Amino acid sequence: MSLRRLSVTAVRNLHPVTLSPSPRINILYGANGSGKTSVLEAVHLLGLARSFRSTRLNPVIQYEQQTCTVFGQVELAEGGTSNLGVSRERQGEFTIRIDGQNARSAAQLAEMLPLQLINPDSFRLLEGAPKVRRQFLDWGVFHVEPRFMATWQRLQKALRQRNSWLRHGTLDAVSQAAWDRELCLASAEIDEYRRNYIKALKPVFERTLSELVELDGLTLSYYRGWDKDRELNEVLATSLLRDQQMGHTQAGPQRADLRLRLGANNAADILSRGQQKLVVCALRIAQGHLVSQVRRGQCIYLVDDLPSELDEQHRRALCRLLEELNCQVFITCVDHEFLREGWQTETPVALFHVEQGRITQTHDHRE
């Protein structure tokens, strides 16, 4: 799948614009602060109804404007098109529309427009808190396991009930036991989905990483959030007093993590910033391969500031891997010359110059 048309209104400093991107490679170039990243942010809003630059959406809305809007026409893998739109008002009203109908949740957008982001903050996947890695893991599971979302919602409901009981003691013994059973059942299913996903991801990740950088001894493992040799109901029973003291459940899928190690050390403690970025790129490209294997569509990759912390050899290797995915890519850079010639002759490449929020297409992929 790919964006055939993208219309952006009142996002950051961007002037209202409608773009016709290439189904493959799109390079946005211009000076720092010109608005290149805001274009990627607009696509991110369209696919996830949130920004990757700010947890608050008010700063995304252009100064003196009350609403920002992003519209996209998506070419579907199975043929045909679908129209997606998101708008956000300063007062907080968020509207999501799919083919003219109001959508129930952002998950519907995410399912139709799977996005992968690679930017200067990508190293946080290794250095950041376990929550960041759980989000990465569950993005992948969501896109390859149709049962994941419903099970995840069951898990969250059971976890909220148990945590409320731990803090306030509002459940009788029978209700508490019932919610504990539901929590354990949903947790076992989530754990199974995650384990199966990591089993499929690891060989693809290792193969992809080997094409980017040599890191002998790097391992990827999955921690499910509780002792692998014990059932969750047993762990919950033995940790009940501590859970009550803490006011929340200490064990379960909500504590899961991905662990990347180099020998006996955490990879983030050993690798340079450039090496960390290559590891993250390999992880995200591997995810794209799995999505294409399970679904008929491809991810769309948003790559912000590609040259950052990568030398020419590694930039070219990354571009080659993205090209081999046969997916749509949006890349930002200051100077496009080193990127423009790095693709196969038959690969459609479109160039967009961004200057003070104005976007001009300087090379059409159809030329």
UniProtKB/Swiss-Prot annotation:
Coiled coil: none annotated. Keywords: ATP-binding, Cytoplasm, DNA damage, DNA repair, DNA replication, DNA-binding, Nucleotide-binding, SOS response. InterPro entries: DNA-binding_RecF, DNA-binding_RecF_CS, P-loop_NTPase, RecF/RecN/SMC_N, RecF_2. One of its GO terms (cellular component) is cytoplasm. One of its GO terms (molecular function) is single-stranded DNA binding. It is found in: Cytoplasm. Belongs to the RecF family. This is DNA replication and repair protein RecF. It comes from Pseudomonas entomophila (strain L48). The lineage of its organism: Bacteria, Pseudomonadati, Pseudomonadota, Gammaproteobacteria, Pseudomonadales.
